[in-house]
């Protein structure tokens, strides 16, 4: 879905007309790309065409409108997570843990993230505890979603941590019991749950928590109307994201933060995204450290 080289990024939009968004030298444009540039899985879904006239400062209002997060810090955090997820896999991304009680719209939130970052024909999938099934999903997806997770075993937790930092795993070849094949795992991961499912310290250190508010009766709408409203704004959201990425890629200013979370490269990218969105470095660091504390207590 995403190709990066130096300060240049290409995001694959549409396989029917071979179009992509190219970001370089602070500019975004839609252009044709050669067939061989991307490997396209059968589950690939074309992205809507972004409105590249939408500026970065318009991103936060759109996120505030469409994501039912608890407070303004979470509006900032989920915006940073979305933009960073579209910067490619040349650094490690946190697991996005979406948590909230019943009726808070967790699945809809995850669907929206997938539609922005890496839309698929299958949509989001229910969680399975089968390791081989999870390995297959992680090896096939840029953004891998697990919906309605109630428990994560130690083995699966370790597997998810490995996928965050990049690793290899083995699975049996089809129709054989003895032959193995090696698969590479490096994926951005989104998970929804009612209660905290990140129990191991390694997974906590590699995650960011997004807390959702329970919807009031007056706020409850049909999923069809919610998603229709979101799809209407999706070209504008994408335009704001791509222009934010253009600012991030052209930012050569050094990050001042002396202390960083475990995913230090992500922390630096978060600060650069914050700069483009008009948010001070210290504010971004405070949000990340507070989120780590909230996650350890959840």
Summary of predicted features, one role per range:
Residues 11-13, 144-146, 190-192:
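Short hydrophobic-aromatic micro-motifs
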Residues 82, 107, 113, 147, ...:
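Conserved RecA-like P-loop NTPase ATPase core
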Residues 1-6, 73-74, 79, 254-258:
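Short glycine-rich, low-complexity/disordered patches
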Residues 27-140:
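P-loop NTPase catalytic core of nucleic-acid-dependent motor ATPases
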Residues 62, 66, 85, 116, ...:
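Conserved, well-folded catalytic cores of nucleic-acid-processing
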Residues 91-94, 119-126, 131-144, 152-157, ...:
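Feature primarily recognizes SF3-like P-loop helicase cores of small DNA viruses
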Residues 150-151, 161, 165:
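Catalytic acidic motif of RecA-like/P-loop NTPases
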